[in-house]
Amino acid sequence: MYQPDFPPVPFRLGLYPVVDSVQWIERLLDAGVRTLQLRIKDRRDEEVEADVVAAIALGRRYNARLFINDYWRLAIKHQAYGVHLGQEDLQATDLNAIRAAGLRLGVSTHDDMEIDVALAARPSYIALGHVFPTQTKQMPSAPQGLEQLARHVERLADYPTVAIGGISLARAPAVIATGVGSIAVISAITQAADWRLATAQLLEIAGVGDE
């Protein structure tokens, strides 16, 4: 039963690019993307605040679902659509403050135990990864593969889910076929020879998400 402690999100979030700059946020919104995440790593709040403010403003202008990775205090301060947290960030974050501010919450998971932890927090959506090997970040866990992803999606049947990790344009149809509601991509767009074409093709496969 999908009864999150945070505001709900659509069951299908569709194509969900994760990018590290306001420039990419603006490009992708202009290309028709409506779910996306600003993920800037390892900088102090004051160093990223201007980018967070600009990204949130763009998200509002395009009526998009913009999640801020990790910088939950800034997300609350500037009223982002939502926050995305890794497992390691859950303990150090004031979830009550995020809830009280009316922000949506997404949580990363890598196995059944982490799914249990995520479910206990009753977030707005649960991310499942990493599906395939990925060069974007060092991962302590092994890739899950499509079979494991499908099992997790079935377990979380009522929950909005996001698949992430090594999802290329070629692999995207098989990932969507598991029933997952969204695919998060990074290098499939940012390292594509033609990012506009890649984005259009991925939108064709994953959609823009439900309203």
Swiss-Prot record:
Keywords: Magnesium, Metal-binding, Thiamine biosynthesis, Transferase
Record-level GO cellular component terms: cytoplasm
Record's cofactor remark: Binds 1 Mg(2+) ion per subunit.
Binding residue positions for 2-[(2R,5Z)-2-carboxy-4-methylthiazol-5(2H)-ylidene]ethyl phosphate: T134, Q135, T136, G166, I186, S187
Catalyzed reactions: 2-[(2R,5Z)-2-carboxy-4-methylthiazol-5(2H)-ylidene]ethyl phosphate + 4-amino-2-methyl-5-(diphosphooxymethyl)pyrimidine + 2 H(+) = thiamine phosphate + CO2 + diphosphate; 2-(2-carboxy-4-methylthiazol-5-yl)ethyl phosphate + 4-amino-2-methyl-5-(diphosphooxymethyl)pyrimidine + 2 H(+) = thiamine phosphate + CO2 + diphosphate; 4-methyl-5-(2-phosphooxyethyl)-thiazole + 4-amino-2-methyl-5-(diphosphooxymethyl)pyrimidine + H(+) = thiamine phosphate + diphosphate
Membrane-traversing stretches: none
Any matching Pfam family: TMP-TENI
Broad class of enzyme this protein falls into: transferase
Sequence positions that bind Mg(2+): D70, D89
Record's keyword annotation contains Transferase: yes
Coiled-coil boundaries: none
Requisite cofactors: Mg(2+)
Highest taxon listed in the record's lineage: Bacteria
Pathways per UniProt: Cofactor biosynthesis; thiamine diphosphate biosynthesis; thiamine phosphate from 4-amino-2-methyl-5-diphosphomethylpyrimidine and 4-methyl-5-(2-phosphoethyl)-thiazole: step 1/1
Keyword match Isomerase: no
Family: Belongs to the thiamine-phosphate synthase family.
NCBIfam families: PRK03512.1, thiE
Function as written in the Swiss-Prot or TrEMBL entry: Condenses 4-methyl-5-(beta-hydroxyethyl)thiazole monophosphate (THZ-P) and 2-methyl-4-amino-5-hydroxymethyl pyrimidine pyrophosphate (HMP-PP) to form thiamine monophosphate (TMP).
Family annotation (PANTHER family): THIAMINE-PHOSPHATE PYROPHOSPHORYLASE, THIAMINE-PHOSPHATE SYNTHASE
Name listed for the protein in its UniProt record: Thiamine-phosphate synthase
Taxonomic placement: Bacteria, Pseudomonadati, Pseudomonadota, Gammaproteobacteria, Enterobacterales
